[in-house]
Amino acid sequence: MAAAPWLYLSRRRSSTQTSLRRFLICSSSFDADEFISSQSRVIGGRGEEEVRFSGALFSRMIHSSTYHPYRQIPLPHSVQLLDASLGCRGFSSGSSNVSDGCDEEVESECDNDEETGVSCVESSTNPEEVERVCKVIDELFALDRNMEAVLDEMKLDLSHDLIVEVLERFRHARKPAFRFFCWAAERQGFAHDSRTYNSMMSILAKTRQFETMVSVLEEMGTKGLLTMETFTIAMKAFAAAKERKKAVGIFELMKKYKFKIGVETINCLLDSLGRAKLGKEAQVLFDKLKERFTPNMMTYTVLLNGWCRVRNLIEAARIWNDMIDHGLKPDIVAHNVMLEGLLRSMKKSDAIKLFHVMKSKGPCPNVRSYTIMIRDFCKQSSMETAIEYFDDMVDSGLQPDAAVYTCLITGFGTQKKLDTVYELLKEMQEKGHPPDGKTYNALIKLMANQKMPEHGTRIYNKMIQNEIEPSIHTFNMIMKSYFVARNYEMGRAVWDEMIKKGICPDDNSYTVLIRGLISEGKSREACRYLEEMLDKGMKTPLIDYNKFAADFHRGGQPEIFEELAQRAKFSGKFAAAEIFARWAQMTRRRCKQRFMED
């Protein structure tokens, strides 16, 4: 199938390779061969050239801009605005001015059964049963009534699938989730299995309830229900919280319960530390353990990634060369990690040189390699260069995927070239790579940034029509854009839609809603949602507490602050508790002063 006409306009050159070479071989403060050297080594019984990095040179690299003046890519014809093409009915709201129109042509082009975002549990559980249970938990937990007694009266046919689905619905609300989990454990004839335990472990890990998490892990150990996933959840949680010693301590628990600590387990921990920007700590751990196991390609790759994430290219180069010295040939994954590391460290010219070496000496760049480069060019608004790389990828026989197109869509959308965005979406369909969840989220973000929430809603509806499940991030973006535009009714309608779809609000969801309600002047309603957050054990939202408190202060209602202070203190939110307690005192003094004056 032929490419979209506008793409050909970017190919004004005798050869894609020739044009790219103009970008790849550019002037720099030092010679490319000095930066990246190749040495002949015998790998696997045959002589091959290996790329080596001169780590010392990283300390004196001078960033050389590779941007070239670019012109706007003309289109052969004008197109309608993107939102008109994706238009369909928005969220239900009495005052909504969202168009009910729908472009049938685009609808027919956007068939996509790929689901992203909220994870779905494959089970035979009746959705209505899940809904009933969640409704009871929602209504009775917040009111502090006997939730367990009502659940008992429901005479549920408990199954592991039901437990997992309910926990999934409350994955951001640890207190109701844990209370339901404990209630289920006490039901006669039911016992948790590894899957339900791991679901609860994930919730505790995400909310950093480490003491409870370890207790659950040990309980699993006594029942013989531990799996490698259990330990992985705990290791990743401690690493994400930068608790290196506790993460390493999971090894001791593995030994206690007779689990083998192999290279995969060590790689998992090193990777978790690296992703938490603890590259140095990952290296120290590796140096302590390297005599006890045989590192493989993945081991060096995760170490490389850890150093690249903290922008330490000298150590990254050392790991790279270490890998080669141990007889391992860096694969395409390692090369892509290094590409990202160079770009993250603002060494664009050096990333381009490495990319050129990959094309000439191997491993040949894959779609991920091109995506890394194109994404960076798009971030810098160097769209013509991004198109050059896109064309070269196609000419190399690689099929662009939704991720590459999403980068281009974001780049052109940021420049407000919505006609070009529309053409890209059209081409995605024609090439058999329809938009996925991330593409739709990128489009919604573009609309939100341009303060066009109604158009974001239309894109959301298109997403639903194409059977792509929205993520919590999708709803948060749309809800925030409506509140920013002071369309409070539609902002609340988005919240209602999210709850209706069974998506558990996270900390950001509550923060957006509470800020919107305060801005609307509905501090009492905002107070109700703040109490709900505290009751669920969620983080205290970052809001203007002084503005929030001033409304109640003027009304002379100190008991509201006292209640909030007590709830915050009980939930361990001591800073917020102090703020509420201070406002309670101020309000009481004011009330007393008024009484004396009267």
Swiss-Prot record:
Which cell locations does it reside in? Mitochondrion
> Which Pfam family is one of those matched by this entry?
PPR_long
- What organism is this sequence from? Arabidopsis thaliana
Q: Where are the PPR repeats?
A: 193-227, 229-261, 262-292, 296-330, 331-365, 366-400, 401-435, 436-470, 471-505, 506-540
For this protein, the record's PANTHER family field holds: MITOCHONDRIAL GROUP I INTRON SPLICING FACTOR CCM1, PENTACOTRIPEPTIDE-REPEAT REGION OF PRORP DOMAIN-CONTAINING PROTEIN
Q: Which UniProt keywords apply?
A: Mitochondrion, Repeat, Transit peptide
Q: Which InterPro entries match?
A: Pentatricopeptide_rpt, PPR_P_subfamily, PROP1-like_PPR_dom, TPR-like_helical_dom_sf
Tell me which positions the record assigns to the signal sequence: none
Keyword check for Transport? no
**Family matches, as PROSITE patterns:** PPR
Endoplasmic reticulum as a keyword of this entry, yes or no, is no
Q: What is this protein called?
A: Pentatricopeptide repeat-containing protein At5g14820, mitochondrial
GO cellular component, alphabetical, reads:
mitochondrion
Which residues make up the transit peptide?
1-98
Family statement drawn from the similarity comment of this UniProt entry: Belongs to the PPR family. P subfamily.
